[in-house]
């Protein structure tokens, strides 16, 4: 380990000189040398301590950074120590002291440089804060509000223009359709046109006459009903209901229509036996072919808990080759099919012979 502190020379033994004055001078000279060495040692300690407290100066507007002051560069404490020690010690001791002091000074310089670099890294160049006045802020806010208003106005104008354009296109399209629908075949065959008008005129007269007759019949029926009593009115109502029921033809079952079984009771009554059960009930859709495919479900189970994926047998193919119900290699299935009726030959049953 190199020694950080420099060697301090001890007070040398006074040499023999001829005369008392020479001895005193030598003693005084030795004492002065000792004082010079101690002063140089104190000065070196102050320099080493001051190197750790050097504040860096950042480059700004052409000002260069300085690591140490110019006063410390001119001082070389190693030389002072070596010169003072060489007067009193041998050549070997002076060489050893010089090497140790040089090593310690180089280590101090390295440590000071590293500390300086670390200090530079820690410190960051802080920019001065910029303060904006309230007037500028209010002006910026007003500009933003004006831009938003302009955007809204421009968007509204664009929307109005697009609506007007669409309306004009619709009008032109309608006008073109009307022009295409105009019948400009007048005067081609006047005789046939006259016959067609005559037929239309006769049909119009017939329709008007039928309406007038129907109104007269309704008026007569109202007058007759006013003259009837309560029993006659009930009998007339039953008669009209039966006539309307007979006039209706029984319709066939529609696609996915719910089936209502009429049962075996009250079949001797006409209201049960002659009723059409294929009519749609209240709230039931009659033509489910017009509905979308997900809504084509029997009954009113759409979007309910009882809805299943199976709709009707015509929609499901149960004759697939990979189906388990038609696997000829499955012995359990073949055994069950053999027990069912109508699935095997009509040969007579073979009776077992008694043994």
Curated annotation (Swiss-Prot):
Which BP terms in the Gene Ontology apply to this protein?
Answer: mRNA cis splicing, via spliceosome; mRNA splicing, via spliceosome
Instruction: List, alphabetically, the InterPro entries matched.
Output: MFAP1 (IPR033194), MFAP1_C (IPR009730)
Give an example GO cellular component term for this record.
U2-type spliceosomal complex
* Region (Disordered) location: 1-121, 226-253, 336-355
List where Polar residues composition bias occurs. Answer: 65-87
Q: Where is the composition biased (Low complexity)?
A: 91-105
Residue stretches in coiled coil = none
Matching Pfam families: MFAP1 (PF06991)
Give the Basic and acidic residues compositional bias ranges.
226-245
Q: Which domain of life is it from?
A: Eukaryota
Q: Where is the composition biased (Acidic residues)?
A: 24-37, 106-117
Name of the protein in question:
Uncharacterized protein C1782.03
Organism whose genome encodes this protein = Schizosaccharomyces pombe (strain 972 / ATCC 24843)
